[in-house]
A protein has these predicted regions:
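Pre-Walker A-like glycine/lysine-rich segment at the N-terminus of P-loop NTPase domains
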Residues: 1-46
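Alpha-helical structural signal
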Residues: 37, 42, 58, 136-137, ...
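Regular, well-ordered alpha-helical segments
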Residues: 46-49, 163
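Nucleotide-state sensing region of NTPase/ATPase domains
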Residues: 48-131, 137-147, 198
Length: 201
């Protein structure tokens, strides 16, 4: 479990400046449209997940007339407290943890899992299985370090095998190699997805 002890914002969407100390339990954000409730959640997600809550681009977070934004959060997980600061400008992001620049974000993401659920995620229930697999993969990234590499290698093998099948002169031996790679990494991916699915229940 992750606890956010404090959050400081400077230039994030509608917030020019804010200091917030959430309570230790459930926090309710109440207010009219456009007052900044979602922006607060987006700031927390950016601090923990290192990317925006809605989409992937950082530019929309910067208020009109500004060139950059900044947030700082003091969080605690696994009995370890750390300060995470994120500075962002047009197309750029700089992350520091305990005042040291973070060069490998994956190291931090493994320690603080955050999986959001927003109204636009209703397609998880109403849509096809692809969206649900994506959610399982997002969850798995935090708990199983090998999952991202398994997915990368699976997609690589799939692309190579499909290209081989489309070619007029396909090598049966090479086709067998890629098929075995698909089976190998596909089995690992399915096992991890099943494990994460059981945890959701």
């Amino acid at each position: 479990m992750i606890r956010v002890h404090s959050l400081d914002l400077k230039g994030l969407r509608c917030w020019q400046k804010l200091h917030w100390e959430p309570g230790p339990d459930i926090n309710l954000l109440i207010g009219g449209n456009g007052v900044g409730k979602t922006s607060l959640l987006e700031a927390i997600h950016l601090a923990l997940g290192l990317r925006p809550l809605l989409g992937f681009r950082l530019d929309p977070l910067i208020p009109e007339g500004s060139e950059h934004g900044f947030l700082s959060a003091v969080v605690e997980s696994h009995n370890e407290r750390r300060e995470i600061s994120v500075g962002f400008a047009k197309g750029k992001r700089r992350v520091r943890v305990n005042d040291k620049r973070l060069r490998q974000p994956d190291q931090l993401l493994q320690q603080q899992a955050v999986v959001p659920f927003v109204p636009s995620d209703l397609h998880l229930v109403q849509g096809g299985p692809q969206a649900r697999r994506k959610l399982l993969d997002q969850t798995a990234f935090y708990k199983h370090r090998e999952h991202a590499e398994n997915l990368r290698r699976y997609n690589q093998a799939l692309a190579a095998r499909n290209a081989l099948l489309r070619s007029r002169k396909s090598d049966p031996n090479l086709l067998d190699v890629w098929s075995r790679e698909l089976a190998r990494y596909g089995a690992s991916i399915q096992q991890i997805r099943s494990h994460c699915s059981e945890e959701f229940h």
